[in-house]
Structures are given as structure tokens and as C-alpha cells.
Amino acid sequence: MSGRSYQVRTFGCQMNVHDSERLAGLLESAGYVPAPEGSDADVVVFNTCAVRENADNRLYGNLGHLYPAKKSNPAMQIAVGGCLAQKDRSVILDRAPWVDVVFGTHNIHRLPVLLERARHNSAAQVEIAEALEVFPSSLPARRASHHSAWVSISVGCDNTCTFCIVPSLRGGERDRRPGDVLAEVEALVAEGALEITLLGQNVNSYGRSLGDPGAFAKLLRACGRVEGLERVRFTSPHPRDFTDDVIEAMAQTPNVCPQLHMPLQSGSDVVLRRMRRSYRRERFLGIVERVRAAMPDAAITTDIIVGFPGETEADFADTLDVVRTARFAGAFTFKYSPRPGTPAAEMDGAVDPAVVSERYGRLASLQDEMSWAENRAQVGRRVEIVVAEGEGRKDSATGRLSGRARDGRLVHLLVTGPHAQEGLVRPGDVVETVVTRGAPHHLTADGPLLTHRRTRAGDAWAAGRAIAGDTPRPDRPAVSLGMPQLRPSAPAAR
């Protein structure tokens, strides 16, 4: 088995990205090696999403493209995991019988065993657990970045949004104890990470199953005491549970970034009620106002669904009004697509697709205007950037580097002056510069760097490079061991 190559393809949210790092770590711990870029892998793993309709189409389209390779090389293995696998189960084998392994959201640790069993038995293996067997953070991980890392604080969700299938696929919320979370954060910082993102389907409800409703604000403050941790982000909060103690912790903890991604979904109270979102527009806007009062430079982004069943032109106008009032720095906008098994899929009042597309276009145009205005306001500001690898798709053509400012904005920067020597500024290093241009989806900084600080993350990136001829090839971080739980997690309060 040693030396077989693998590739993990990830669809969906940050939870899936984090899970894919665990899948890669599990495979490498079992003797697999990453497939070189552009080559065929011996094992291809799809970590799937089930939130939107195009997720299904994307998976089955990719599986279809792999069929000729599988037919010509029967030893190749294909595995499908994640939310769509949890939902579709045997349907995947009906539609793509050349798949070797199907596993769900609750048993990702079983992947190496299932691959070996499928190979040994020459038969597809379908194993879907109905409850979480092992907390993902106890598994080894192959992190994609030297300078940043995801840290799960909870899995699952207790909300009942009528459009969302996630709770039925990932189960009810289960919280990690704060000591376990902080132990993982400290271990990641010891490895060189500068930035961590706390992950949960609803971070604001963190701690309820532990009997401490204020646990999330306390966790943010505790992260502020971790030496060497420069940036803390989190996703995703829920407006219903967003409390002032969290805003105070964000504003008073220096390494918590001035950034908030808070899903709106709709600006209409009527639609929010049908969505069962448990808050109304005034509450949402009140949170935005209080966040901006505490952190005037905070970048606030959101999610919005267009064309939910029953949405009228007046409802849509309410959404546009919230977008104007909130002045979002950016938004992920989606056309509603019914997901089988959700209450919304059975609702009357389906909106004509042509109307949905027209509204979607208007929303996108308005949000681009708002984003552009917000980003133009950044021109002339001094920003701190952690240089990243692969953030800017055109970096090689433009000669720029890219990275994220503290507020999460993407910045493309030109390295000039004494710092311009090739290789001097590395992914993971921290620089300061001045914004020279604002575009709808990014900032540009073409002036000279004001400061450049080498970091342990940059050192790790440099140490991990392998030289092929004269071309440096950056390597990824080594596999991190999973974090043992200090105490058993309490069962979720239901």
C-alpha cells in the first residue's frame, strides 16, 4: 500500500475544507502520498456538499469524467464522502457504480480502512454512521497553509432553518470543551501558525451544551492570551444568538480581527419567518450598528438567498434596503434551490426562475456598488498583510504577491524598493503597506513596503521547499497529529 498516491477534491463550506485536511492527514498516516500536480492519482476522494443543487451536478459530473480513467485502470479507487454522501448513500452507487467507497460526515476516520477493504474484497464499501464517532480534531491533519489553520469548536447544528439540510446530515450541535480548543490552538501556534479561524455551524451558541452560554466570548478572550497568536477569526455566527459580550470581546481582544461574516439570508421579516431564522431585520441591523460602534473599521460580510418560496417584489426590496443600510464589504449571494427533505422544498409559492435570475442580477449589481465604495474608502490606509500563497490567481502575470489584511480583505501588493529581491518576502511573512486602489472584490497596494517581518510561518515555508532544477517548489506543512480530548465531551442538550 505504501506509496499509492491520493488527491482530495473539496466542494462546499469551510467545514468541508477542514475535514479534507483531516482526510489528507489520515491518508498520509496510512502510507499514501499526495499525487503530483497534473498527474493521475491512485485514489481520488470527493468531500461533498449537499446545500445547493449544483453540488449534486458537480459531483456526478466529476465522477463521470473519472469513469474512463477507472475503466482503463481498475486498481484506481474513488471515494465519496461528506454531506452528499451522508444524504444519498446507495444512490451514489446507482448513479456511479464505479465508485469504490462511500462514507459519511460522522466517520471520516474510517476512510483508510474502507479503501483497503474495498481493494481486498473487490467490492464497493458503503459505511454511513448516524452519529459522530470521533471528533475530527482528534485526527491527524495535513494543513494547506503554514500560517493559518482551522480549529473546530463544535460540530452539528440545533437550528431548524427550513431551507437547510445540514442538521439532518451533521447532527445536533456538539461542543468541544474550551481546554481542548485552546490546547489545539497552542499546538498550532507552536508549529508556526499566526492565524486561526474558529469553526462552528453556529459559533454563538457555543457552550450551551456545556452549561455556559457565555463560553464563546470567554474563548475569544482566552485566544487573546495565547502568545504568538496574531490573528483570530471565526465563522459562522447566527444573528439570533449574537450577544453584546461577544462584541465586547471582539473589540477588547487585540488579536481578534475586525471582521464579521454574519448571514442575513433575507432582509424581509416575512421571508425570515418562512425560513425559520428566529430573528428579524431590525435585530440584524442592530448587531451591525453595535459592531461598527465598537470597531469602526470592521469589515462586515454576509450570505443572501434570492427567490425563496413566496418571496415577493416587496420582500426583495426589503433585502436591497438592508444591503444599502448595512454597507456590506462583500456578500455571498445564492439563488434558492430546493433541497429534498427540507420543509422549504414542500412550500407553495415557488418564484419563477426568470424572476429569480433578474433579482439576483440586481442584488449582485447593488452589492458590487457597495463593495466598491467600501473598498475605495480604504485607499490611503496603512494595512498589515500576511502574505499567502495562491490567493491571487494573476500574481505570476502581474508580478504581485497577495494576502489578507486584518479585516479579511484580499490585497494584491507589489514588492518594490529594498524588499524587491526575489524570495525576500515569503508566504507567511507579515508586511505593511498602503492601499493605492480599491476594486469591488480586492484592494491593490502598489507602493513600497513600509515594513517586512519574517515569521516562523515563513521559515517553515522556506524549509519545506524542494528544489527541482532551478525552480523552487513550495511544499505543504507536515502532517499534524490529532489532539487528544482532555475530557469527554458532554452530550448535546436537546
Curated annotation (Swiss-Prot):
Q: Which residues form the Radical SAM core domain?
A: 143-374
Q: What keywords are annotated for this sequence in UniProt?
A: 4Fe-4S, Cytoplasm, Iron, Iron-sulfur, Metal-binding, S-adenosyl-L-methionine, Transferase, tRNA processing
Q: What does this protein do?
A: Catalyzes the methylthiolation of N6-(dimethylallyl)adenosine (i(6)A), leading to the formation of 2-methylthio-N6-(dimethylallyl)adenosine (ms(2)i(6)A) at position 37 in tRNAs that read codons beginning with uridine.
The UniProt entry lists the main location of this chain as cytoplasm
Q: Which cofactor does it need?
A: [4Fe-4S] cluster
Which Pfam family name is an example for this entry?
UPF0004
**The EC number(s) this enzyme carries:** 2.8.4.3
InterPro entries, per the entry: Elp3/MiaA/NifB-like_rSAM, Methylthiotransferase, Methylthiotransferase_CS, Methylthiotransferase_N, Methylthiotransferase_N_sf, MiaB_methiolase, rSAM, rSAM_horseshoe
An annotated GO cellular component? cytosol
Q: Which SUPFAM superfamilies match?
A: Radical SAM enzymes (SSF102114)
TRAM domain ranges (all copies):
376-449
- Superkingdom, taxonomy of origin: Bacteria
Q: Where found, per UniProt?
A: Cytoplasm
Summarize where [4Fe-4S] cluster 1 binds, as residue positions. Answer: C13, C49, C83
According to the entry, every stretch annotated as the MTTase N-terminal domain falls at 4-120
The UniProt family comment states: Belongs to the methylthiotransferase family. MiaB subfamily.
The segments labelled Disordered in the record are 465-494
| Gene that encodes it | miaB
Cofactor-binding details, from the entry: Binds 2 [4Fe-4S] clusters. One cluster is coordinated with 3 cysteines and an exchangeable S-adenosyl-L-methionine.
Quaternary form? Monomer.
Q: What is the recorded name of this protein? A: tRNA-2-methylthio-N(6)-dimethylallyladenosine synthase
Q: Where does [4Fe-4S] cluster 2 bind?
A: C157, C161, C164
Q: Which CDD domains match?
A: Radical_SAM (cd01335)
PANTHER family per the record?
CDK5 REGULATORY SUBUNIT-ASSOCIATED PROTEIN 1, MITOCHONDRIAL TRNA METHYLTHIOTRANSFERASE CDK5RAP1
